[in-house]
Amino acid sequence: MIDLSPLVRRLAGTPLASWSQGLQAQLEAKLEKGHGDLDRWRGALQALPTLQPSEIDLVNGLRLDCDCDDATRAQMRQALMGLSPWRKGPFDLFGVHVDTEWHSDWKWSRVSPHLNLKGKRVLDVGCGNGYYQWRMLGAGADMVIGVDPNWLFFCQFQAVQQYLPELPAWHLPFALEDLPANLEGFDTVFSMGVFYHRRSPIEHLLALKDCLVKGGELVLETLVIEGDENQVLVPEDRYAQMRNVWYLPSVPALARWLRRAGFSDVRCVDVSVTSVEEQRSTEWMRYQSLGDFLDPNDHSKTLEGLPAPRRATLLARK
């Protein structure tokens, strides 16, 4: 059983205290429903060797290390491989380099210089396997809660968390919709790589705003197109072979949507075209990746003939 009492204690005396009281029951109800592969993934977690990190680096990447022999390292590698595919990372765990599909460290290096997370209570919506949560702690966050309903990501987070049990990071297998309205308890809320999957983008922005304290900051990272404030791409069917992509606004259009949703001090801090070096298939993620979804003769377009993935990060204040 995953014991959330440390989280409840951490949130005592904060605006999130009453919400925290029901989290254990909510988590156990989710675990009871579970997933067909959950037992297999739990087996991989149980196969991880018992180690105590003597070196922890969450600032320059995500690296844990200690003196361990080749057999222990091989055991670590096999157990982690049992949690494939690994999408966000990379992780360096006791000499095992988990070469994930995404170079999430590149994105973090673009975004983090614009943030001040020191002492902040942070929510990461659609947190994936928690890679960014650890980096947020490395940047000085007081605590980080991540929510993502994907069970494999939940187990991947547990794989790292079992070596960092004292650090104030928690992964809840919840969707944003599972959080109560008007939480108003987080200093910073992240939504990275989620917005374009939402059928109702303004509703998503309002739900994110609900999670923030007054004066809190939203960090929104999403797919965009070039153009003015009236330009928005709505794919006819698929985008880069994804069926669940709904809205790709221009940066000025997205800024307007944020203002319309009641945010202020809206600013874009980064725009970058995603390269096939930043997102690609690896030994740890053997399925198709970005290179398979672009026009082979023109990487500025997707297979559908639409503009290739371009991502922007906008900051806004409640």
From Swiss-Prot:
Residues recorded as binding carboxy-S-adenosyl-L-methionine, renumbered to this chain, are K88, W102, K107, G126, L176, E177, M192, Y196, R311
Task: Report keywords, A-Z.
Answer: Transferase, tRNA processing
Task: Fetch the SUPFAM superfamilies from UniProt.
Answer: S-adenosyl-L-methionine-dependent methyltransferases
Q: Which GO terms describe its molecular function?
A: methyltransferase activity; transferase activity, transferring alkyl or aryl (other than methyl) groups
Gene Ontology biological process: tRNA wobble uridine modification
- May I ask which residue range the UniProt record assigns to the signal sequence? none
Which reaction does this chain catalyze? carboxy-S-adenosyl-L-methionine + 5-hydroxyuridine(34) in tRNA = 5-carboxymethoxyuridine(34) in tRNA + S-adenosyl-L-homocysteine + H(+)
Q: Name one Pfam family in it.
A: Methyltransf_9
Q: Which InterPro entries match?
A: CmoB, Mo5U34_MeTrfas-like, SAM-dependent_MTases_sf
Q: How would you summarize the oligomeric state and partners of this protein?
A: Homotetramer.
Q: Which NCBIfam families match?
A: PRK15068.1 (NF011650), tRNA 5-methoxyuridine(34)/uridine 5-oxyacetic acid(34) synthase CmoB (TIGR00452)
Protein family per UniProt: Belongs to the class I-like SAM-binding methyltransferase superfamily. CmoB family.
Q: What does this protein do?
A: Catalyzes carboxymethyl transfer from carboxy-S-adenosyl-L-methionine (Cx-SAM) to 5-hydroxyuridine (ho5U) to form 5-carboxymethoxyuridine (cmo5U) at position 34 in tRNAs.
What is the protein's given name? tRNA U34 carboxymethyltransferase
Question: What is the protein's species of origin?
Answer: Pseudomonas putida (strain GB-1)
